[in-house]
UniProtKB/Swiss-Prot annotation:
Ranges in the topological domain labelled Cytoplasmic: 23-204, 247-339, 677-711
Keywords, in A-Z order: Cell inner membrane, Cell membrane, Membrane, Transmembrane, Transmembrane helix
Family: Belongs to the IgaA family.
GO cellular component, one term: plasma membrane
Gene responsible for this protein: yrfF
Record's bilayer topology term: Multi-pass membrane protein
UniProt key word Transmembrane helix: yes
Species for this entry: Escherichia coli O157:H7
TM spans (from-to): 2-22, 205-225, 226-246, 340-360, 656-676
InterPro entries: IgaA
The name this protein goes by in its record: Putative membrane protein IgaA homolog
């Protein structure tokens, strides 16, 4: 519930913000020049100031109706006040003046940056390098109502009917009227090619794109609750980066270019270097700033009437017929190789992080199978599964009766500590062959017989048969001694179990001492000859305990070895069939876990525990479900099928996203790496090609007859 409330609140806030932005933008469209003075302070127009403005506009209208020297009246200028005229904008800025050819008594045009303003002509003498200006809105041009402390209100009180003639002043920050006339042909916006020269190189956008790649990577390793926020942030960063790189510039960001016609002249002294000469060229009152690589080609236009396009900061965009920044960018595009390098490096970083931190085997297999169209297979018999034609990526659901595989040393298993050891129920052997019989061992039977014979004589029970009378046995027990009433049987069972010379050495030595024999062979001969029948041996309790421990220690290796051997003998299934393997080590059987692991039992109990496990797991029901990740057939003809648990919806999206991110990073690294190299090579030769282009245009080489292609 709280998540829905937060989402609705965020949606409402975004809607309000979008509405406010749309309202502000629509208002700025009505006053397009307001953007140029975004940092200006504002105040309200006072009644006295409004009265002075109205009087000035009335007198201006009367003067403009007077015919000029040629008999033509001046073009009407609409400077009527409107609803926005009550807002006064205050700013400090430089004023640029251009002269025009017209009968207008006020033949100058004034600009603040790219915005033309109406400046009362009697204030021209007060223009400085930096001017404190107050403006108000009108229907056409912004009207200056105050300049450097001089106001219309003061002027209208002091002077009436001032002839609107320009007053030359030596205090102005611009050249006087003795300068040559400049004709303003047009005012246009810069082209996209010209804008590209001042546009940033895209390093910030490249870093935003790399940051979005990193956030997409973290979406794969963070909990699901954070994934929507990370993915949303990554999409916003990616969108911002791509928009900054490829979006066309907004109209408001395109600077104005003034198209002028005049005669450029060099005002420098003789002996100046090339850099000083290129900076000392003026067009009338305007000091021109040329691109450095134009220096060899501007001399031919000096002293001649030429069309020149400039920014308000006096930087040239075009001069004459050939020199043009627009044509340079159009014919020889800018090569931003550094941003491609940054994106390629970021893609490689994320690619290496994917390779080392994220398991890619399952996402790739799942994605490929999903693209190929995987099938769902259900089988309850070996024949059904064999006829289904299982492929990697298929969803498999099988059930039946099989055998848990035996884990052997040197073989890999996803489950490191199975409770059914030595059986591994995450691997099921499934075939139609007869079940293997329960394991048997003659050595284990002999070890068990020896252990039981010693236990029966050392720890007799009242109901056990004995070769001595009950009264004698009772008397011996009361004396604290232990009676071995069939010592020969122990010797024979020991000889039967420990047939090798090095087997049970300590036990044999103990029995030799108890039988007062020369060596073990002599003792065995006596037992085989029946000379030990009826021989009773009395033992102290300590000796009896030592004999019991010796028997347990001597029989343990035989039982342990036979248990391992029997387990390995089960690891030889019949040819053919299937081996179903869980990639994550999940058990396919629903059997109760043993109370303890097989190898945690004492050696004398391991064999019985192993037989119980074998009886339960050699023919057990199982259910296996998952996505097929691998299929191969071994030398025995058994088909191995690896299964990965079926992921939930979140897991499926993670698999697809991992593959998509991997392929995207690989493609981005290759593409941007190649682009960075190519752009770097072109960037190195771009200026030489531009100069060669200007040389061919300004100094064309005539083709001699011998070089003509037409014979």
């Amino acid at each position: 519930m709280s998540t829905i409330v937060i989402f609705l609140a965020a949606l409402l806030a975004c809607s309000l913000l979008a509405g406010w932005l749309i309202k502000v933008r629509s208002r700025r469209r009505q006053l397009p020049w307001t953007n140029a003075f975004a940092d200006a302070q504002t105040r309200k127009l006072t009644p006295e100031e409004r009265s002075a403005v109205e009087n000035y506009l009335e007198s201006l209208t009367q003067v403009l109706q007077v015919p000029g020297p040629t008999g033509a009246s001046a073009a009407p200028i609409s400077l009527a006040l409107n609803a926005e005229s009550n807002n006064v904008m205050m700013l400090t800025h430089a004023i640029t003046r251009y002269g025009i050819s017209t009968d207008d008594p006020n033949k100058w045009r004034y600009y603040l940056d790219s915005v033309e303003v109406h400046l009362p002509p009697f204030w021209e003498q007060y223009i400085n390098d930096e001017n404190t200006v107050e403006l108000i809105h009108t229907d056409s041009l912004p009207l200056v109502i105050s300049l450097n402390g001089h106001t219309l209100q003061e002027y209208m009180q002091e002077t009436r009917g001032y002839a609107l003639q320009p007053v030359p002043s030596t205090q102005a920050s611009i050249r006087g009227e003795e300068s040559e006339q400049i004709e303003l042909l047009n005012i246009r916006k810069e082209t996209h090619e010209e804008y590209a020269l001042s546009r940033p190189r895209g390093l910030r956008e490249a870093l935003l794109i790399v940051a979005s790649f990193l956030m997409f990577f973290f979406c794969l390793i963070t909990p699901d609750v954070f994934v929507p926020w990370l993915a949303g942030g990554a999409l916003l960063l990616l969108g911002a980066g791509l928009w900054g790189l490829f979006a066309p510039p907004a109209k408001s960001s395109l600077r104005e270019i003034h198209c002028l016609r005049g005669t450029p002249r060099r005002w420098g002294l003789f002996g100046e270097n090339d850099q000083e000469q290129i900076n000392n060229i003026s067009l009338g009152i305007i000091d021109l700033v040329y691109p450095a690589h134009w220096q060899p080609y501007i001399a031919q236009d000096l002293g001649q009437q030429t069309d020149i396009d400039i920014y308000l900061d006096r930087h040239l965009v075009r001069q004459g017929r050939y020199l043009s920044l627009h044509d340079e960018v159009k014919n020889f595009p800018l090569q931003h190789w550094l941003r491609s390098t940054i994106i390629a490096a970021g893609s490689l970083l994320v690619l290496f992080m994917l390779l080392f931190w994220i398991p890619l085997d399952m996402p790739l297999k799942f994605t490929l199978s999903w693209m190929k169209g995987a099938q769902t297979i259900e089988a309850t018999s070996v024949k059904q599964l064999a006829d289904a034609g299982v492929r990697v990526g298929d969803t498999l659901r099988i059930s039946g009766t099989g055998m848990c595989n035996i884990r052997t040393s040197g073989t890999w298993s996803a489950k490191t500590n199975s409770p059914f050891l030595p059986f591994d129920c995450s691997q099921i052997i499934w075939n139609d062959a007869r079940s293997l019989p329960l394991p048997e061992s003659e050595l284990v039977n002999k070890a068990t017989a020896l252990t039981e014979a010693v236990n029966r004589q050392l720890h007799p029970k009242p109901e056990d048969e004995s070769r001595v009378s009950a009264s004698l046995r009772s008397a011996i027990q009361k004396s604290g001694m232990v009676l071995l009433d069939d010592f020969g049987d122990i010797v024979l069972k020991t000889a039967d179990l420990c047939s090798a010379k090095d087997d049970c050495v300590r036990l044999k030595n103990a029995l030799v001492n108890l039988g007062n024999s020369k060596d073990w062979d002599a003792l065995v001969k006596r037992a085989n000859a029946g000379k030990l029948d009826g021989v009773n041996v009395l033992l102290r309790p300590v000796s009896a305990e030592s004999l019991d421990n010796l028997v347990a220690t001597s029989t343990a290796p035989f039982i342990t070895h036979e248990t391992a051997r029997a387990a390995q003998s089960l690891n030889s299934p019949a040819p053919g069939g299937f081996l179903i393997v869980s990639d994550e080590g999940s058990d396919f059987v629903d059997q109760p876990w043993p109370s303890a692991s097989l190898y945690d039992y004492p050696p004398q109990e391991q064999w019985n525990a192993f037989q119980k496990l074998a009886q339960m797991l050699m023919h057990t029901p199982f259910n296996a479900e998952g996505i097929v990740t691998k299929i191969f057939t071994d030398a025995n003809g058994t088909q191995h099928i690896g299964l990965h648990p079926i992921p939930d919806r979140s897991g499926l999206w993670r698999y697809l996203s991992t593959t998509l991110l991997l392929l995207t990073m690989l493609g981005s690294a290759i593409y941007n790496g190649v682009q960075a190299w190519r752009r770097y090579q072109r960037h190195r030769t771009r200026m030489m090609k531009i100069q060669a282009y200007y040389e061919s245009c300004l100094n064309p080489q005539l083709i001699t007859p011998s070089e003509s292609l037409i014979e």
